[in-house]
Amino acid sequence: MTSIVDLTPSEPALIFTGNAAAKVSELIAEEGNPALKLRVYVSGGGCSGMQYGFAFEEAVNEDDTTVEKDGVVLLVDPTSLQYLQGAEIDYQEGLEGSRFVIKNPNATSSCSCGSSFSVDGGASCSSH
């Protein structure tokens, strides 16, 4: 019996855009610590049930997924990766201000605030 194994890479765990990497690089330079990496994570809370968070860290945990773009490293823990698989991390500047934006294909609903989401049609957005 012959089996065929597809060795082509599957879709990336996360997409880290050039705009996001450039802004993170700028923020790291302001901190004066080139060892910093950006961690993106998901936690319970927010008006849609789950929310995104960002933090600078030096250490990489053994089970972290790392994504590198233009010399900047993005870290994601395994639990958060379950919710962020295939998401795009971007940085946008516009009339509403400047912010990091996560385009998450796993979110079934999200709040207008942009930092809260649900994966199972959870709570609707309440006023902030």
Curated annotation (Swiss-Prot):
Keyword Iron-sulfur: yes
A single GO BP: iron-sulfur cluster assembly
Record note on cofactor: Binds 1 iron-sulfur cluster per subunit.
GO MF: 2 iron, 2 sulfur cluster binding; 4 iron, 4 sulfur cluster binding; iron ion binding
Keywords linked to the UniProt accession: Iron, Iron-sulfur, Metal-binding
Pfam families in alphabetical order: Fe-S_biosyn
Cofactor: iron-sulfur cluster
Keyword RNA-binding belongs to the record: no
Chain sites annotated for binding iron-sulfur cluster: 47, 111, 113
Function as written in the Swiss-Prot or TrEMBL entry: Required for insertion of 4Fe-4S clusters for at least IspG.
Subunit relationships: Homodimer.
Similarity section: Belongs to the HesB/IscA family.
NCBIfam families: iron-sulfur cluster assembly accessory protein, PRK13623.1
Protein name stated in the entry: Iron-sulfur cluster insertion protein ErpA 1
Gene source species: Methylococcus capsulatus (strain ATCC 33009 / NCIMB 11132 / Bath)
Organism phylogeny: Bacteria, Pseudomonadati, Pseudomonadota, Gammaproteobacteria, Methylococcales
This protein's encoding gene: erpA1
